[in-house]
């Protein structure tokens, strides 16, 4: 179990810690690490995009582009991970996506890119969290959205 003591001082969460926090696994774990964590307030998720990912075989065969819905999922996983970190990583908790608002896709994300997902907490009420998310490649905004999620006890 990851302690929440000193979470504001935690600078990064590596893949091993992510695997202990999130239930997602290959091919659906869409973040490689989280950096610049400021408690539950904000963090940056990192996803290294490679041609070996299964969605590139069909999206699109001659010009591979990361599907926008997977960028949204990477945003949700980053937000969910920081929310769970601040609960002390209780394995009985899961984060379910509730809404996606104002999603915009500005530029394609392709193999070789490093996606940086900037997540900021907007609102916290009970088990609900609302986040502002901005995805960037080389400091250029490629996608953005507001997401809401609910933390629930796993049955």
Curated annotation (Swiss-Prot):
E.C. number(s) listed in UniProt: 4.2.1.59
InterPro entries xrefs: FabA_FabZ, FabZ, HotDog_dom_sf
Subcellular location field: Cytoplasm
Gene Ontology CC, one term: membrane
Entry keyword annotation includes Lipid metabolism: yes
Reaction it catalyzes: a (3R)-hydroxyacyl-[ACP] = a (2E)-enoyl-[ACP] + H2O
UniProt function note: Involved in unsaturated fatty acids biosynthesis. Catalyzes the dehydration of short chain beta-hydroxyacyl-ACPs and long chain saturated and unsaturated beta-hydroxyacyl-ACPs.
Protein name as catalogued: 3-hydroxyacyl-[acyl-carrier-protein] dehydratase FabZ
Species for this entry: Bartonella tribocorum (strain CIP 105476 / IBS 506)
